[in-house]
Amino acid sequence: VKNTRSSEDIDKFINKRRIYDILGQDDAGAWIAKTFPDLIYIRNKEIYGWGPSDEWVKENVQSKGALGTKYPNRIWATEGDSPAFMHLMAKGLNNPDKIDSGGWGGRFGLTKVANIRGMDIAQRSGVDESLYDPYFMFTNTSEGNESINRWKQHIWNNLSAKMTWTVTSTCDDANHHPIAIIGKDSTMQIIYLSAESGSKVSLDAGMSYDPDGDNLTYNWCFYQEPSSYKGLVSTDNNKSSHLDLLIP
């Protein structure tokens, strides 16, 4: 890239790139972070603990048709590297450009950290990341792997449902996730609202629906960890389709 583009074009190229690194399995990440210091480079060091059990995989994945039979038995961690892909999915508050918001791929700090080393196995193979010191990457917040664990049941449900799709002949024979609508907004975009302290914000999800005609349940929650406000937020009517939220 540096040999074929101007400095301005390199900057444009780098600004379009996002790298999500699981544990650091060789020294390529250190070289990249050193060579392109302005790159958004995430190294997730708190990745395990959310994956389903072998029994769950057998029942919900491997038992489902020809595709399921291709799913291998676990050697290390089930779906161990999948959070790198899930970081791109529009679920919950996830936004690849706001890495501190949290989502299925985890949650990361906004300050780069120096010299985050990769896996021990990489070091034992002769890789020496210290050759590129200092290099800087974004990494996990103090929430650690709990930032993925809080969503794990939803991740499992999603995988199980999609495996069922592969063995059903019609759409009606499979289950599909409900469509969440806030006000009249049915997109997967993040909704931003401005409000003053002491005012009330009304959130209405009453137009949400399930494409299969199943009944809906609601559970509004305040995700405190990524918030700048660390006090209590009342969500007393959080099981209703409508939430009135008093801004602290």
Each language-model region and where it sits:
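Short beta-strand segments within Ig-like beta-sandwich modules, predominantly Fibronectin type-III
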Residues: 233-239
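N-terminal acidic, glycine/proline-rich low-complexity segments
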Residues: 1-202, 208-211, 215-230, 242-245
